A protein has these predicted regions:
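Extended alpha-helical, oligomerization-prone segments that build pores/tubes and scaffolds
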Residues: 1-177
């Protein structure tokens, strides 16, 4: 009797929490982020995490090395996105990582070493991409895994507010006028 081990690989949906302090939808999106042209997510990494990206597929090695050589940068935008509850420790140097979900021209995407076919481009719109930037350096570009170019985010609002995707939370609702 011979036993066989079979390995199956499949893509399954996953859900993650992203702080509202790290979410930047297109300001013109109204109350639905999917009506916007782009969505930007902010994250932070320490030097080891950035260094580990050098060997990861899809990352532009030279760009990651350039980000490491530049070191963690504190820009005015990055200081604006820092949530009040986050550590203000300046010794804990962190790299600011930005993920851009949106559309770019095919030529621009290919200039970032992303292989895309002519049929990846949506007519009069562009190529749906995800661009990863560390500090201000693009380090990775790939085709958005969502077939229609949608953003992989949904907001849960306790109470909707016209013109805002964030809505109003419970604390605001129970506040006296």
């Amino acid at each position: 009797k011979e036993e066989k081990i079979e390995t199956l690989q499949e893509i399954v949906p996953e859900s993650n929490y992203t702080s509202v302090w790290n979410c930047f939808p297109d300001p013109a999106c109204g109350d639905n982020i999917h009506n916007g042209q782009f969505f930007v997510e902010h994250d932070q990494m320490v030097e080891k995490q950035v260094r580990d990206l050098i060997t990861q597929p899809g990352y532009i090695k030279e760009a990651v090395i350039a980000a490491l050589e530049a070191g963690p940068m504190q820009s005015s935008i990055a200081s604006m996105v820092q949530a009040p509850h986050e550590s203000q420790d300046i010794v804990a140097a962190r790299y600011h990582v930005w993920y851009y979900y949106g559309f770019l021209k095919r030529e621009d995407v290919m200039a970032m070493q992303c292989l895309c076919e002519a049929d990846d481009e949506i007519e009069n719109v562009g190529v749906p991409v995800v661009i990863t930037m560390i500090n201000d350096i693009p380090v990775k570009a790939h085709i958005n895994p969502m077939d229609d170019g949608c953003f992989p985010f949904e907001f849960m609002c306790w109470q909707k507010v016209a013109g805002s995707p964030f809505g109003v939370g419970i604390a605001r609702q129970i506040r006296s006028c």
